[in-house]
Amino acid sequence: MNTPPPAAAGSEVIWLYEKQQTIHARSVSGWFTHWRWALVWLTQVVFYGLPWLSWNGRQAVLFDLASRRFSLGGLVLYPQDFIYLTGLLIVCAYGLFLVTAVAGRIWCGYACPQTVYTEMFMWIERRLEGDRMARIRLDAAPWGAAKALRRGGKHALWLALALWTGFTFVGYFTPIKTLWAEAFTLDFGPWEWFWVLFYGLATYGNAGFLREQVCKYMCPYARFQSAMFDKDTMIVSYDAERGEMRGQNARRGRSGQAKPADLGDCIDCDLCVQVCPTGIDIRKGLQYECIGCAACIDVCDGVMDKMQYPRGLIRYDTQNGLAQHLSRWQRWRRVARPRVLIYSAVLLMICGALAASLWFRTPFKVDVVRDRGALARLVDDGRVENVYRLQLMNSSEAAQRFRIAVSGLDGLQAIVAADVAVGPAESRWVPVAVQLPALQAQNLGSGAYPIEFAVERLATPDDDTVWRSTERSTFLLPR
């Protein structure tokens, strides 16, 4: 009942669920490979090094979830600043749309974490097990001391790199110097243990085993990228008009003879397939598995040099460029097309709005929380008192003094210190008792009445600007 019907003559059966086959990608060198490794170094120096930098005595980049404070150098954000995170995510999304419309999956091929860590893991693999053919022979060889030593060493280094990656990731959310001190005694908290192991093992599994499966099946970007492509998108392309018909070296002669007239420049060496990290044949045309890494371009250019043919049989080009034989200048002129211009305009507007909002935002935030222990109570002389807790969040790099006042009802009075000091990039909870005289309370009767807290940042010798922020709440009168 589960047996598929026989295929018609001349047709091909495509299985929806294909068994994973190990891809042993061949090493390659060239212009694009050098750029890819440059970006590997750049991204990893930033990722591993950023948490260790200090800014005014604190960790420069720290997403302190426990304190609900995010530090990005001199920029301190609180949960009330969630709009900025939303804006940043929108900027990243439109940036990805723009890059994809112009140059295809170039992000995937050069800077995606999956690609970056797979490259690092494959480098370790090549150092210990050899290049493609050596690894294939090692896979087929029976288990012995040499094989166990090579495989064990590889996995040990993979795990070390993966756990260090997990440790660094947690260091963005817990002070990394504290985390480093705890590492020597293995005195991590339960959540720290969980995330170091989870992120580390996820890196180990994704970069060591799943590899191209993540790009082909797990990553949603591979599926919806075609919605952002058009015929003027720069992609890795095979020039079939120049390359076909393919032929082996034997038909071309090896003693300076000219190649047969019926053969194209492609010598059918399959090196472009062997170096591809996703195992595809770029000569079949645009495929969703292609991540745009250009490994096939580098290896093909090397073959063309040896054959004394012009480079560019496989190259970055557009579908229109191949079909219409466009020059490089003509191809780049088509970059400024409506899709790209719209993405660019929206991206610039969002970046401008985000930058302006950050520039003009107040240097502090206020949050009002009612004391849940006692909603309202009677105190001396029949006055009615409500108790609140105000969180004063200083997002500047200098200590600030604040003055708190309350309004909204006649006779309302805030019982709080005249000035409240908050350190640089810190927050402080301040208890505030708000009292209403008995006469006004009797005239109003029971119920909830709107009031407003006004928090004023006092001028300092370095900054005479007076900032003011207001927050609304309610004052409860009991029956």
Which functions belong to the PLM regions below?
Residues A414-A441:
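Intrinsically disordered, low-complexity Pro/Gly/Ser/Thr-rich segments with frequent PxxP/GP/PP motifs
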Residues M1-R246, I297, P310-L347:
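Membrane-embedded alpha-helical bundles of multi-pass integral membrane proteins
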Residues E397-G411:
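Short acidic, flexible loop segments centered on an aromatic residue
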Residues P437-R479:
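Terminal connector regions
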